[in-house]
Amino acid sequence: MWNVDVTCIGGIRSGEATLRPGPNIVQASNFQGKSSFLAAIQTAIGTTGLLTEDHPLMENEDDGKVTLETDEETYTVSLTRATDSDEPAISRSGTPYLTRDQDQIAARLFAVLGEDNPIRAAVREENQERLTELLKKPLETENIDLRIEALQREIKELEDEVAAAEAASADLPAAQQKVTRLQGELRDLNETRDELERKVDEETDQRALRDELTAKQSDLEREEARLERLENQVDRRKAQLDDKEAALESLDIPDSPTAEADIAEKQTRIDELAVKIDLLDDLHRSTKAIIDEGEIDLITDVERTLSGDTFSCFVCGAETTAEAVTERLNEISDRQESLREQRATLTEEVTQMQQRTREIESKRQQKAELEDEIKRLRVDIQEDQHEVRSIEATIEELQAEIEQREAEYEAAEKAGESHSAELKTIQQKIGSTETKLDRAQAELERIEAELQKRNDRQEQLETKRDELETLRQRRKQKYNELVNQFDAAMADIIGRFAPGFDGAYLDQKTDANDTVGFEINLARDGHTTDLDTLSEGERELVGIVTALAGYRTFSVGDRVPCILLDGIGQLAAEHIRHMIEYLENTAEILVTTAYPEAGSFDGETVSPEHWDVISHETAQSRDHPQITN
């Protein structure tokens, strides 16, 4: 049961009403506050001021308020007009029934079915593009499309990196062949040098000096090549260290959620609630069937009197009446709903805790990996730098020794024969070839490192593709469910209302860019037709069915237990009754409006008799139109 207290909302200066489970019909003539009362309920649940709409504060009033009292909680929402600007803006304060943006958007689109409902308006205006935008809105609040776009960009970047690595792999055979060729050339040069050295040894006594000088020169070239490779390696590792440290610094690990024991406890509570709900449901259904069918005398003795029938309670034996049993059944129904709400709340909490635990664990693992890699890189850099300093000292010593040996060799060379010049040339070629070989080996190592990087990026690419497919499947599942719910609801509506068309279908279309669109198509007399061929009432009927499909697809009933229906004056009185009967089992509380001439309806009648509303004349004197009907 809901109690609603309204002050300065729409056309209601003050008023209050009680809403009970089942249909609640606000029945009155124009300018008695019917639509304003529904706007007040909207304000309390938090669905006003969305989609570029204004809050329904009464014209020329600076403050308004709605208080919603449920069986468990009281919600108060205030509207305030800012008076310090040329175009006063209306702000909302307080805590509405719905606080999350995605819940408010879903309820505005699919539970608040007034004449200004955006879904009904899009169908009424035959705006299929706007209809698509609105039907996709709840998923936008989950950022699914944005997350898909971000993943697509990340996948494109990874694919480019993999392609670059693949291009590098194409150079691998040539690099391997170059290293093999240079190794062969170096072997040939060494053999030639050995032969020349033997000839020179036969003609001169320079062997000791030459060997020592050659060894020192070879040592120097090798050390210089080692130094170059080490310096390049230090630079690469420093760049990797900067990247890892930046990634570690940007990594945000949320606080740890409640322990696993809390999750297990909540799950146990959910299971217990499910058992209780089933037990109460069995008791309620069987007892209500006996009362509704008037078959109480099957299980107990009934005493029929002028003042009313009484009988012995078939459970405790006490004397009671059908009215008392019915009242007790209503209490059991209220208890059932309370247990369902508790179960839904606990289920959502468990889901959120489990998701948060997985996210935290993933980020912790990522942090540990980054910290290990940073530690390893720092140790490697320190070792490399120490080795660089050692090599630099060795190079300085070799350069000094070579300079000394060259002077000694040049002095002794004059006594040598013609083979000395050729030997020197070969020695220079050997040094040059060794340098080329070192560079070729370094290039080969770089290409092999690129191939390893490709493998790492390929693993990341597969992970991102799996994540993208998961999001696409969730989006596809919701879109398919939306189409199925529309088809099911439309089949029910056609059976109940017998409109002037054979069927309506919500078609889902996907373009080359993977963008999904929706379009309503109709069938009449075996042919496909458009919305513009429908009557005004038929078009409103299709709009309401579309909104109901969204209500069921996005589980709006689990977020707010009511549907508000207004602006259905285009429907005949019997069709309004059919609509109320159809919606009665969709939401716990149904609130709709009707004119007195529509006759009586089953359910709770809400009378604005004691409300203080602005009159028709007052409404016409306003600078802007006001909700008053």
UniProtKB/Swiss-Prot annotation:
Superkingdom field: Archaea
Main location as per UniProt: cytoplasm
Protein name (Swiss-Prot/TrEMBL): Smc-like protein Sph1
Location of the protein in the cell: Cytoplasm
GO-annotated molecular function: DNA exonuclease activity
Keywords: Coiled coil, Cytoplasm, Plasmid
GO cellular component: cytoplasm; DNA repair complex
Coiled coil: 139-282, 318-487
GO annotation terms (biological process): DNA repair
Family as reported in the entry's similarity comment: Belongs to the Sph1/Sph2 family.
Primary role: May play a role in a late step of replication.
Entry annotated with the keyword Coiled coil: yes
SUPFAM superfamilies the UniProt entry points to: P-loop containing nucleoside triphosphate hydrolases (SSF52540), Tropomyosin (SSF57997)
